[in-house]
Amino acid sequence: MERTAQDQLVLRWQDSAPVDVLEGDAPDAAKAKLVARAVARGTYELPAPAHARPYFFHKDNRDQTVVTVAERVLSLEQGSNFRDLGGYPAANGKTVKWGLLYRSGATPLLSESDRAEIASLGLQQMINLRSSEERQLAPSRITGVPYTAVGYSFGAIMPKGAFTPETGYPAMIDLLDPQLKLLFAALLRRQAPVATNCSAGQDRTGIASAILLSALGVPRAVIVKDYLLSTQYRHPEYEMPAIDPAQFPGNSAAAMFAHYRPADGKPVPSPTPLMTADGTPFLTFALADIEHRWGSMDGYLERQLGVGPAERAQLRKDYLE
């Protein structure tokens, strides 16, 4: 499913057998309304309000099975990389439920329309992975949601100079340990929908999302593909306000983030692909480090985060369908 224009959506599926198409404002087919019957061409176009986020349901006319789909990324006016982790294939032939697990970039410049759209998600928890300095520079405009952050210095990400993915991504495994434990604790309490974010919504959030999807049994190739979507869906101009480093003395992140929206009006740099020159996704450096240090992702989840077989079974019961 994709938005081909602000007011136009297209649904696509591979099976040519007839399906009924239903639409609802929540991921619950029982409450959805029929919009098209016995569509057999594998595609269906329909109008959509610019900022509504409907859910659609394909009901197979042969066996009445239902597949839920939605837009992966929220169509925000001034947000960045805010997307749903639903719909991915997971353990035991199931899929990740839509509308419960979100990932995002920072949200300091949301419009009022954006705030209303995010409020409609019914978030029960936000896990903010940003440093203390980043949160000072760009406070979130999302209100009314329990907000969890763990203070640390931005310098911890680049303690010896320029960030390199080969060393920086493995280092983030330890850096994010407290936040990851809080994320899984919230999910095991069924405190969802939950949104996890950092500044760009790609590096720290990419690692956290990869670990969460791994716990749900999502295949590695799908996890990496989701990670790489950030290049397409980021809008750096909305991740930070215009910053004058002189206004933030002692803030070690101010100079770096000043380029997001330079005070002198220069263009905001475009996102760059999250891979090395030879095509290696940066995320794989973190995943390889986990497997080297703990033997496997399951070993890491159990011994480091306390998410053993029983906890993974509960997560899959609650967040898969």
Language-model segment annotations:
Residues 197:
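Residues at the beta-strand->loop junction immediately N-terminal to the Walker
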Residues 200, 204-205:
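Ser/Thr-glycine-rich phosphate-binding loops at phosphate-binding pockets of nucleotides
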